[in-house]
Amino acid sequence: MFKITEGDFKNQTYGDESYLSNWPMLYILENGKQAYIGESNHVKNRMSQHHSSVDKRIFDKVHFIYSSKFNQSV
């Protein structure tokens, strides 16, 4: 089974769960019209990188998709 959570990309509000620091997961940045899909093992760091990118500032929401069954091959 997997879980999907939502965060506020513009305000960098993602939560403080440990899986955000060191867990393989998929994520979707979106604004209702466009989406960017990515994967990372260190999603908090990756979100900081995206937030610094002018191209990614069009997004306002982030969805994290994770599972205890995900591994490095995600």
PLM feature spans:
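GIY-YIG nuclease catalytic motif and its immediate N-terminal context
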Residues: 1-49, 72-73
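A broadly used, surface-exposed interaction patch
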Residues: 43-73
